[in-house]
A protein has these predicted regions:
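Long, histidine/aromatic-enriched segments associated with O2/redox biology
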Residues: 3-403
Length: 403
């Protein structure tokens, strides 16, 4: 990642970032902002923006004070970044690197949200407990079990910390990760990151259903933020779930799913629709007329199920998963053409938020074992993070685990 002429440590980066003169953009594109402080972190139930930069970090320092200082610095920076504050270099410090990386100067907040999470490795791997945090690890915060057919790349999976930056302007999202990476210098190092474009789900009732790179509407039956009962039951950690520091938080699971376009593009329209279980143009379930028609899993025609047993919509349905649901908030991605193959390296960067990771695990087991979509996709990266609730004003993300 581009880090500028020189990295800035946590203390220096924070002091310089907040010490310049604040200027607000005068452009008219990408306005609007979401407050950083709330009962839950932003970027979860917030209306899904069009662009994402997801980054994970490994903590290189062994001092718990460095970790807490980093989280404090990140929180302070996040408050300013999400408000759209922009900083100019001090005219008296022209011999020093500028306080802000600069690529967002003149841009508005673009509804930027920053969501932070803690990976299992932060709480100790095997017998190692470098920060004395093992006692705070939620029992369910473990790497998901292996799933049939996946081909995970370890260098693009896992991580001690994650930051999800979402915005209507991709440069604003990039700028946020760039700034936070710069602040982390000397305490944590970027492990891997993923750029995403074009949301693949709707998180509020006012949003229309987008299409994924396979051309199908995606996330029709997603949980909506206005459905507070469903959010409470399926997304937000409750006081009885434990540990206390995760109450009002959630668990993030990310999966990088490559689409095998050579296979998919050669599949007939009927084959594609039977693979998904929906009509490609309208998004209606097979046997239905409109996108939001009830998915009838019992309907037959000519003695055959209208929605096949291995259709994605059947296997992912709450009706076949003991009522389990997850909040999807993924994005499309495209890296480049693979050298010598002519194949496009593109697909879905799947992100799901859930009250308990077992919700995702149970659903994914069914999909991995039986989903017709597996012939057209391959999972190449995976990560899980505990996302605590929003800190209180003046506090910092995850502060209670250091008390």
């Amino acid at each position: 990642m581009l880090l500028g002429a020189a990295g800035l440590g946590v203390g220096a980066g924070l002091d310089q970032l907040l010490g310049g003169q604040s200027t607000r953009s005068t452009t008219t594109v990408g306005g609007g902002s979401f407050p950083f402080y709330n009962s839950h972190q932003a970027g979860i139930a917030t209306p899904a923006q069009e662009h994402m930069h997801f980054a994970t970090f490994d903590v290189t320092s062994s001092a718990v004070s460095d970790l807490s200082d980093l989280l404090r610095a990140w929180t302070t920076a996040a408050v300013s970044l999400t408000k759209g504050d922009r900083y100019q270099p001090d005219p008296q410090s022209l011999s020093q690197p500028p306080s802000d990386t600069g690529e967002a100067i003149g841009l508005r907040p673009s509804q930027l949200t920053l969501t932070f999470g803690f990976g299992p490795s932060l709480f100790g791997v095997d017998a190692s407990d470098r920060f004395d945090l093992a006692r705070h690890r939620p029992p369910m915060l473990r790497a998901p079990p292996p799933f049939r057919g996946e081909s995970l790349q370890s260098a693009r999976s896992g991580g001690d910390l994650c930051v999800q930056a979402c915005a209507e302007d991709p440069q604003v999202a990039f700028h946020a990760i760039h700034v936070l990476s710069r602040i982390a210098n000397g305490t944590a190092v970027l492990r891997w990151s993923q750029l995403g474009f074009g949301r693949t789900s709707s998180t509020t009732q006012s949003q229309t259903t987008p299409r994924n790179l396979m051309g199908f509407k995606d996330g029709t039956d997603n949980i909506r933020a206005e459905d507070t009962a469903a959010m409470t039951e399926h997304v937000w950690v409750q006081p009885t779930d434990g540990p206390d520091w995760m109450t009002n938080g959630t668990y993030l699971i990310a999966r990088r799913i490559e689409i095998l376009f050579d296979v998919w593009d050669a599949t007939s329209l009927e084959g594609q629709e039977r693979t998904i279980g929906r009509q490609k143009k309208s998004g209606a379930p097979l046997g239905g007329r409109d996108e939001y028609d009830r998915v009838d899993l019992e309907a037959t025609s000519g003695g055959q199920l209208v929605i096949p047993n291995d259709a994605h919509v059947r296997l992912a349905s709450p009706a076949t998963n003991n009522g389990e649901r997850i909040l999807r908030r993924g994005y499309s991605f495209c890296e480049a053409t693979e050298a010598g193959t002519g194949s496009i390296d593109a697909g879905l960067f799947f992100i799901a938020f859930q009250r308990d990771p077992r919700q995702f695990i149970d659903i994914q087991k069914r999909l991995a074992n039986n989903d017709a979509l597996n012939r057209h996709t391959i999972h190449t990266a995976s990560a899980i993070f505990a996302c605590p609730p929003s800190p209180k004003p003046g506090g910092f993300i995850g502060q209670s685990i250091f008390s």
